[in-house]
Amino acid sequence: MLLRSLAFLCLALLPQFAHASSEPLAENVMAEVMKDLSAPYTPQEKLAGKMCLNGASVDGFQGDIIEYWANLECPYCDIKEPLAAQRDNPNLCIVVRHSPSASYGESVKKSLVYETLMQLSPNAAHQFWSDILPEKGKGVPVPYEASLQKALDSAAISTDSFVATLKNQAETVSKDIVEAQNLISTTPTYIMEGIRLPACDFTAKEIPSALALAKRIRSHKDDTIHELIEIIVKNITEDGTV
């Protein structure tokens, strides 16, 4: 019943894929950053109703909010480092956004499973993500069925409860896919202070530092934008999206 429910929801979501290619040249990256800076960024409004990695609601959150755009079949889209950053920084809220791959039909299903588990048990959701993350250098998608059952068993979640919750998460993933079409060129991509940082698989310690840099740029306190451009170009080049 779980697999049938997932397959039905995915049929409605798959036609919405449309990912743009990424240009790693510094001038193009600069143009994209300037585009981001030209628009106001209101994460409380944009992410209303969503959850931080620790299960807290974005609604009413008083600290800094970061978007973490990921594809659960991307070997560089680790959940452990963002989760560690969330735990170590109580004034930080990291929100997962989904940009599934169009190359594999299971990608959307994994996003749906993760969002459903987040509603029922964030710990089970993060364990599921870790279990299905492909090995770096291989990138071969990992089947999710056994990991899903393991997550359900570990959190004592009934099949009926999972299926009932699953039906409400299709809209969440669908909205992410639509937004990603003209916004996200590669994964992982962080959005900090409204600035996209593509192909940046930051460590837990690097995330607050990158946020501080983005905040300085957004507030025009100093001329650090070229430092940010160098970070983005370096990561895009190493990611192989050139």
Segments from the language model and where they lie:
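A short beta-strand-turn-helix
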Residues: 46-65
